[in-house]
């Protein structure tokens, strides 16, 4: 996703291409936690925060890979605590605090059971309706395209008229 960010925005700025980010927690609780944190601030921050997650994905994955048991234990806590505890233990509150989402704001967002359930239900409903099996998944004019890298997507956009 990071390799195509700037070129994609150039197509969008030309008025020929539109881009809509839809977040799906296809990989389970960690995706749900990160998705909720990217949506914790103002709407205009969602894409920049998502870009930061993708750009730092290896760093984000290190604590959970090093301590899967702690993450799994956090997921056994009551719903209003589990994502807060996981984010504290894995350093995700610090990650987002460095990008404008205060720790208090992050804790509040991650304790919002209704919002988390809505996100999980959204993922379940649309993942099956649109056959979303991984990320990224791209759709062009209502049809899923067989591309998950910028190198594969750009020629498809160009064949559809993007310049």
Where are these regions (language model features)?
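Structural alpha/beta surface segment adjacent to cysteine/selenocysteine redox centers
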Residues: 2-82
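C-terminal cap of thioredoxin/glutaredoxin-like
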Residues: 83-163
